């Protein structure tokens, strides 16, 4: 028990009790056996100075009551349960103690463990370790998902799907089984569905990434673009499609362009198409309605122009022009209109002009109109119009009009009009209506000469 008061004669009614009037005052507040030092006060107890208690000496025991004060300075006994002020708290738990939803506004549904809805209205989480920052009508149903904000965005549940992100926008959707590491930045009505892994749409409207195989697909922006080939990319534009059946297709921009096969590239333009079972590393830079197609068509190239075609040819090139066709491997058309290298014209070239045809391997037409190399061996027409090399070949027409070589090897017509060389190792320089039918013959010029 505490000792009795000392110096009682010094204690007077209404006066302060000094520290030396009481012995063992420290023990009374710090001893282990507190019952021996109980202090009872009837009436009011007023402290005008500071009160200090050593924190380590406080008893740590659960009690149903605490002391509290209000702005009048009075002390009250309160239930500990009254400290949970649900009305004034900004956040509260959702379906259990392991998730958080706003308390003072909105309607929310959070059933995910360790998940948080920070703001907005009518947002819903039923995936674990997920987060919705703001917006309305957003839903995150897979684990480790993130929706930053926006309206009616959805990350829906699927077998073994997790770790997906929608930053914002409206009506964007991530769905399907095995859909991991997917991303939609913003925009409207963009979808990533039924892909395995690693799909991303940065923005735009009504863009779609889909396919039941592969991953690594990307759409930058634009409208109504589609990627369903592994590692396929559409940077922008509208109505572009990187189709399945291959991998690594690329469309830069433009409208209604399409690719099918391994690593095809369409940089831009409109209605350009690369398609075929074994297309690899073919490219169309621009233009309109240009096509590279066929069962086998590798490393072919169209630079631009209108309605140019490379059907089933490897390493073929059309630089530009209109309605040109390169059907042979390693063939070349520089430009012009309606020029063609047929399927038998391997390693042949038409530089320009109109309606020129190279059907012989390793042949060359520089330009002009309606010139034809249809010989059995490589030959050359430099230009002119309506000139023809047929027969054995290894022949040359420099230019002119309606000149024809149809004989054996090594024949030459430099120019002129309506000249014919059906000989062997023979030469016509120029003139009109000249004809050679012999061996090792020459007509330098003139009209209606015969050799």
Q: Where in the sequence are the language-model features?
A:
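Periodic small-residue-enriched repeat registers in elongated scaffold domains
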Residues: 83-451
């Amino acid at each position: 028990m505490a000792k009795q008061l000392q110096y009682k004669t010094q204690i007077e009614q209404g006066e302060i009790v000094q520290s030396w009037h009481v012995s063992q005052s420290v023990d009374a507040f710090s001893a282990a056996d507190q019952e021996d030092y109980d202090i009872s006060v009837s009436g009011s107890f007023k402290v005008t100075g500071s009160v200090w208690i050593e924190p380590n000496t406080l008893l740590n025991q659960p009690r149903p009551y605490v002391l509290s004060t209000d702005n009048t300075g009075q002390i009250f006994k309160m239930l500990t349960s009254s400290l949970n002020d649900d009305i004034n708290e900004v956040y509260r738990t959702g379906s259990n103690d392991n998730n958080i939803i706003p308390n003072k506004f909105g309607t929310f549904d959070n059933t995910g463990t360790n998940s948080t809805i920070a703001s907005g209205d009518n947002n819903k989480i039923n995936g674990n370790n997920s987060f919705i920052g703001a917006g309305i009508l957003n839903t995150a149903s897979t684990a480790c998902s993130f929706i930053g904000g926006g309206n009616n965005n959805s990350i829906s549940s699927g077998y073994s799907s997790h770790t997906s992100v929608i930053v914002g926008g409206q009506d964007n959707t991530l769905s399907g089984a095995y859909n991991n590491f997917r991303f939609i930045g913003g925009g409207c009505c963009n979808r990533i569905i039924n892909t395995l892994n690693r799909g991303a749409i940065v923005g735009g409207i009504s863009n779609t990434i889909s396919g039941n195989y592969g991953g690594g697909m990307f759409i930058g922006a634009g409208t109504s673009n589609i990627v369903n080939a592994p590692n396929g990319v559409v940077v922008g534009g509208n109505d572009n499609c990187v189709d399945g059946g291959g991998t690594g297709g690329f469309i830069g921009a433009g409208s209604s362009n399409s690719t099918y096969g391994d690593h095809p590239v369409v940089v831009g333009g409109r209605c350009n198409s690369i398609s075929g079972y074994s297309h690899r590393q073919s490219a169309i830079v621009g233009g309109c309605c240009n096509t590279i197609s066929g069962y086998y068509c590798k490393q072919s190239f169209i630079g631009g122009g209108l309605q140019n075609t490379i059907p089933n040819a490897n390493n073929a090139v059309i630089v530009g022009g209109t309605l040109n066709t390169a059907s042979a491997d390693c063939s070349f058309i520089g430009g012009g209109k309606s020029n063609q290298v047929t399927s038998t014209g391997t390693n042949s070239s038409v530089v320009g002009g109109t309606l020129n045809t190279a059907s012989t391997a390793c042949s060359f037409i520089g330009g002009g109109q309606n010139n034809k190399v249809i010989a059995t061996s490589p030959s050359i027409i430099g230009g002119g119009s309506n000139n023809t090399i047929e027969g054995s070949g290894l022949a040359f027409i420099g230019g002119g009009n309606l000149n024809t070589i149809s004989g054996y090897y090594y024949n030459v017509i430099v120019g002129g009009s309506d000249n014919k060389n059906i000989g062997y190792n023979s030469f016509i320089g120029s003139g009109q209506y000249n004809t050679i039918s012999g061996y090792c013959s020459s007509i330098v010029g003139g009209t209606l000469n015969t050799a």
